[in-house]
């Protein structure tokens, strides 16, 4: 079974209640129910956190086939001192748009990640680095058109390391991201 992981960042737990003039009245639960109904043969996993480190951990967990959690330690087949930076560079060089099977024994093929990093879009170099290491496509989603928002929101640190970006289509952007991943 194909799996798509949707990761939302800070304040998106308040979707449907927060700044409804910008973000709309649909909750993320409603969005997920609609998406699951549209694509019953796909397993969706939804994660949300207001904490930057959680988003980084999840992108690494889902997006990097062999994980980078132990990359700071030398491991077999790697030279002494081979660390996270080397592993990340290797992952970036070997980056592929093909689905990755999780080594954990999970039978689901990860097709990609849909990422709405919220405010971390504009500030998190660490999240950008995690996305750059992803071996599955990451689609950046923004409910509003950040290019038409306040000056500080117009810069995305993620766009150039994501496979695709969708912005300004409301919560339909999540469905569009799923469709983009399915089309491959």
Regions found by a protein language model. Name each.
Residues 167-184:
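A charged, well-structured terminal subsegment
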Residues 14-29:
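Glycine- and acidic-residue-enriched helix-capping/strand-helix junction motifs
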Residues 1-4:
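Extreme N-terminal starter segment of soluble prokaryotic enzymes
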Residues 108-147:
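Mid-chain, well-packed structural core segment of small domains
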């Amino acid at each position: 079974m194909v799996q798509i992981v949707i990761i939302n960042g800070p304040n998106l737990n308040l979707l449907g209640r927060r700044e409804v003039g910008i973000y709309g009245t649909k909750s993320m639960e409603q969005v997920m129910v609609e998406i699951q109904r549209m694509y019953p043969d796909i397993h969706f996993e939804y994660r949300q956190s207001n904490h930057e480190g959680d988003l980084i951990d999840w992108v690494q967990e889902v997006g990097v086939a062999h994980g980078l959690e132990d990359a700071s330690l030398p491991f077999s087949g790697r030279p002494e001192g081979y660390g996270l930076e080397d592993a990340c560079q290797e992952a970036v060089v070997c980056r592929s748009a093909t689905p990755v099977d999780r080594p954990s024994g999970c039978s689901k093929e990860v097709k990609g990640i849909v990422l709405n990093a919220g405010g971390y879009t504009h500030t998190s170099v660490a999240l950008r680095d995690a996305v750059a290491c992803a071996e599955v496509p990451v689609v950046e989603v923004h409910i509003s058109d950040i290019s038409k928002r306040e000056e500080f929101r117009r810069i995305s640190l993620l766009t150039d390391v994501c496979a695709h970006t969708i912005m300004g289509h409301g919560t339909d952007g999540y469905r569009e991201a799923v469709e983009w991943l399915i089309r491959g």
